[in-house]
Amino acid sequence: MVTVYSKNNCMQCKMVKKWLSEHEIAFNEINIDEQPEFVEKVIEMGFRAAPVITKDDFAFSGFRPSELAKLA
């Protein structure tokens, strides 16, 4: 399952979620503004900015369609 760590008012987060929905890729969203207990996990993965997208051991940050396509 794909997980998207997002933040409020994050344009790249919105773009990632829209892209995944348009390509019918199911995802679970964790909003780190609303669930701050996940901030440390994102930092431990080596990321400092949202969105962070993960699936199994694959993770990346930002709106990157070429990487999003690998999640299908």
UniProtKB/Swiss-Prot annotation:
Intrachain S-S bonds: 10-13
Q: Which domain of life is it from?
A: Bacteria
Quote the Gene3D superfamilies the UniProt record gives: Glutaredoxin
Task: Pinpoint the Glutaredoxin domain residues.
Answer: 1-72
Q: Does the keyword tRNA-binding apply?
A: no
Q: Name one Pfam family in it.
A: Glutaredoxin
Q: Which CDD domains match?
A: NrdH
Write the record's keywords in alphabetical order, separated by commas: Disulfide bond, Electron transport, Redox-active center, Transport
Return one GO MF term: electron transfer activity
Per its UniProt record, what PROSITE patterns does this chain match? GLUTAREDOXIN_2
One record GO biological process: cell redox homeostasis
Q: Which family does it belong to?
A: Belongs to the glutaredoxin family.
NCBIfam families in UniProt: GlrX_NrdH
Give the protein's function. Electron transport system for the ribonucleotide reductase system NrdEF.
Q: Which PANTHER family does this one have?
A: GLUTAREDOXIN, GLUTAREDOXIN-LIKE PROTEIN NRDH
Its name, as the record gives it, is: Glutaredoxin-like protein NrdH
Q: Which gene encodes it?
A: nrdH
